[in-house]
Amino acid sequence: MKTLATIGDNCVDIYPQLNKAFSGGNAVNVAVYCTRYGIQPGCITWVGDDDYGTKLKQDLARMGVDISHVHTKHGVTAQTQVELHDNDRVFGDYTEGVMADFALSEEDYAWLAQYDIVHAAIWGHAEDAFPQLHAAGKLTAFDFSDKWDSPLWQTLVPHLDFAFASAPQEDEALRLKMKAIVARGAGTVIVTLGENGSIAWDGAQFWRQAPEPVTVIDTMGAGDSFIAGFLCGWSAGMTLPQAMAQGTACAAKTIQYHGAW
């Protein structure tokens, strides 16, 4: 079996201030960051038949991701305008392009059979795949980002081994939410807290991980890096706190340069 495949969103992040464009998106980023740990992840996503689509596929292949199921569709590749304010990213206009109609084919499902872990995020139009993937014995992971009001918290979590999210800081309200998520059926919930580290609830106890002290250049990809480091650590047999520490180290590396990768 192969370690991990991601499904769903891709996006070209366009930085007008830098006059540069970087390939990204949660599914793409997590796959790329997993290559840091010596594995070849797979990725299922849709790109347009434009220059950005060509760039994204070339970038993924260069980084060591299996692009056999990065499908090219007629239309525009997803893209986001990004500005930097005090080294933090601020998202501007977003064009979803061909990703608006994303769905897995039967052939995509068959291809995923070779992977142990499948990950997606809330923007990827991939949530409908998770009941089938979980029932097939895949370890499933999903990133809700900061969308705490999403109805997917009610419907999707019984099909998740790991539910990831983000919040500004830990407080009692957050801890209660995390307990409720696991009670609803998720295996473990992990919340990244930016400069405040991360916290996990596994149904028995809370686990906390402090951030690594580094010079921040660009926070793009920090959360995706954490997820990749965590999942690769878990698949290698790490404990929950060990996997959180590896996720933190992966994120610390990413935030020290411009762009996701």
From Swiss-Prot:
Protein keywords: ATP-binding, Kinase, Nucleotide-binding, Transferase
The organism's place on the tree of life at top rank: Bacteria
Stretches that traverse the bilayer: none
Gene3D superfamilies: 3.40.1190.20
Catalyzed chemical reaction(s): N(6)-(D-fructosyl)-L-lysine + ATP = N(6)-(6-phospho-D-fructosyl)-L-lysine + ADP + H(+)
Pathway given in the UniProt record: Carbohydrate metabolism; fructoselysine degradation; D-glucose 6-phosphate and lysine from fructoselysine: step 1/2
GO molecular function: ATP binding; kinase activity
UniProt keyword Coiled coil, yes or no: no
Protein name (record): Fructoselysine 6-kinase
